[in-house]
A protein has these predicted regions:
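Oxyanion-binding and handling regions
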Residues: 1-29, 40-46, 99-225
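DPxDG-like acidic metal-binding loop motif
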Residues: 67-98
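Phosphate-coordination loops involved in phosphoryl transfer and adenosine-cofactor binding
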Residues: 3, 65-68
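Phosphate-handling active-site elements
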Residues: 56-63, 91-101
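Glycine/charged-rich beta-loop-alpha catalytic/anionic-binding loops adjacent to active sites
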Residues: 27-36, 67-70
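Short glycine/serine- and small hydrophobic-enriched flexible loop segments
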Residues: 52-53, 88, 92, 183, ...
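N-terminal phosphate-binding loop and adjacent alpha-helix
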Residues: 35-56
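Phosphate/pyrophosphate-binding loops at sites that engage ATP/ADP/AMP, CoA/4′-phosphopantetheine
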Residues: 51-66, 136, 157-164
Length: 225
């Protein structure tokens, strides 16, 4: 079944990515370079031109798109917000639906994986990681439980207990990539579109600035005022 043209974005890491997908085939893709000073690569002035370049590479106009899919996190607070803002803007500007997908799922989905259990991880700072378990069988990827925050030094034990292979950018072997949307597009469509006005990324934890503010003031930021 044809699914038309999909624009996919992910900003869960500082190496943000974009892909244009026709049905289930990636026809163009781009990725920002991950840099030592993360604030520089997640900014809109870098991400938006990458989106435009990717559309141009695929010879696709925004008006040709059937939908936009955005990685929902967890991950980098700033980069997730940038990608989400761009995705929402394109959806509103073109009148197409917005869908969301787990960025941890995109780690597994970006390449063909052997059948079995996989524990996908992303850095969560403070010597912790975001982690979620997935099963792969005949190229079908399924979630096995929700995303969690684990301590880095518990990862090997956690994976061994689950009989899973570790994969993810905290280990330097994979990052989420928007191209992974092609492998899981059917599940994304089945999950339903997002309400553009209310949808926000799943950051996984409070922003570092908010943590510091609450520690200094002894109360939640939401209680300020």
């Amino acid at each position: 079944m044809s699914t038309g043209l999909t624009l996919a974005l992910d900003g869960s890491t500082y190496a943000g990515s974009v892909a244009v997908i026709r049905d289930r085939d990636v026809i163009a893709e781009r990725q920002l370079a991950s840099v030592p000073h993360p604030g520089k690569s997640g900014k809109a002035e870098n991400f938006m031109p990458m989106v435009a370049e990717c559309l141009r590479d695929g010879q696709v106009r925004p008006s040709d798109l059937a939908r936009v899919v955005c990685g929902e996190g967890p991950g980098s607070f700033t980069s997730l917000r940038v990608a989400a803002s761009i995705a929402k803007g394109i959806a509103v500007g073109t009148g197409i639906p917005l869908y969301a997908v787990s960025s941890l799922l995109l780690i597994v989905a970006r390449e063909l994986r052997d059948d079995g259990m996989w524990l996908a991880v992303l850095p969560a700072m403070r010597e912790e990681v975001f982690a979620q378990q997935f099963s792969v069988e005949r190229h079908v990827i399924r979630e096995v439980g929700p995303a969690r925050i684990l301590r880095e030094h518990d990862l090997e034990q956690e994976a061994a207990h689950a009989g899973a292979s570790l994969i993810g950018s905290s280990r330097g072997d994979a990052t989420p990539h928007a191209r992974g949307v092609a492998a899981v597009i059917d599940g994304i469509l089945a999950s339903g579109r997002c309400d553009i006005d209310s949808w926000e990324p799943v950051y996984g934890r409070l922003a570092e600035a908010q943590v510091k503010w609450e520690a200094a003031h002894g109360r939640p930021l939401s209680a300020a005022g």
